[in-house]
Design a protein with these regions (language model features):
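A short, Lys/Arg-rich alpha-helix, primarily the initiator
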Residues: 1-20
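Short alpha-helical DNA-recognition segment
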Residues: 16-34
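Residues within the helices of the helix-turn-helix
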Residues: 9, 20, 34, 48, ...
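DNA major-groove recognition helix of helix-turn-helix
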Residues: 26, 37, 65
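Short, basic-rich loop-to-helix N-cap that marks the start of a DNA-contacting helix
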Residues: 39-52
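The alpha-helix within a helix-turn-helix
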Residues: 12, 23, 51
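Short C-terminal boundary/hinge segments that cap the last helix of small helical domains
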Residues: 55-65
Length: 65
């Protein structure tokens, strides 16, 4: 199974937020953002920070394919 973050990108569009703004709000590194873009594993702490910034649940930003 592979992790997909396509729901994260849809949510960013819905909230009219770009990746740079998300990085600023969550202190995510460029390397971690690249991992998200490639659908690679990232630290759970990063996912929690994203959810806190976007006021959503983990299931709102990721899924297993």
């Amino acid at each position: 199974m592979k992790i997909s973050y396509k729901n994260l990108w849809k949510l960013l569009i819905y909230k009219k937020m770009n990746k740079a703004t998300l990085r600023r709000f969550t202190s995510i590194s460029a390397a971690t953002m690249a991992k998200l873009g490639k659908g690679e594993n990232v630290n759970t702490d990063v996912l929690i920070r994203i959810c806190e910034a976007l006021k959503c649940k983990l299931s709102d930003i990721m899924e297993l394919e």
